[in-house]
């Protein structure tokens, strides 16, 4: 159980990290990480491609104890970005998905019946929040804009730097560990969903939003960056033919994004969708079939002819969906 274990690391990070070398980013920023790796550190993905602005915001959060929120469309790698930075700093990282079933009890803890000397006794089991606050942990709240209001006000207690966590049931006040860090990812900027893409998101109290020191936006990547991601994850496409195919995939994704902005279609392809399509292509060896399975079948039936037209523009081939049966 997490709540029964302490992470034994120095109170402060003890190893200098060369940002330019480790993250391939032209920056003079100096950051510190931990020399030793523990079981809570995410696995390093050597093919990961870092976005400069997002990475610098995350690094500032780690180095200067800033509360960092990353906002952006789905599939852009917001949470993965934090994990991969943490992995290279050897910084323990825990992610919590703030779905509607997460409660105050889940975060703070509860009384539980346990066996002690063959007798049942009631004992308080602390939740993930007190455990994280007391350890050198980067705590990441995913889907932050889906959290319930009562849960959000629990989080508000620790948003301020050196903000102490009070457990009323235990008459206990917990001071944060000097290397505790807090991050969040969100699809909206706390004003609710205006796109229709993110059902279930809620408006966030502006007093709470004000407590986040840094808000950076990670939306869709430029084509060269996105191509690097796809080629890195699907090395079979590193040849000339494969790169040309990947470029056409990304071109099609851009058309769906532009179509969404213009309100021509209600679905769009994220970088994750493009990557999934490339991986499915390697399985089925059929660009049309893998496209249908990855994205087209998820589109509104009335919009499929438009998406099929995008496909024809990029690949010079027709899909059967190109012709609207109602026309």
Which residues does each predicted region cover?
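Alpha-helical lid/collar subdomain of P-loop NTPases
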Residues: 1-38, 48, 55, 222-227, ...
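AAA+ P-loop NTPase catalytic core and its hallmark functional loops
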Residues: 1-243
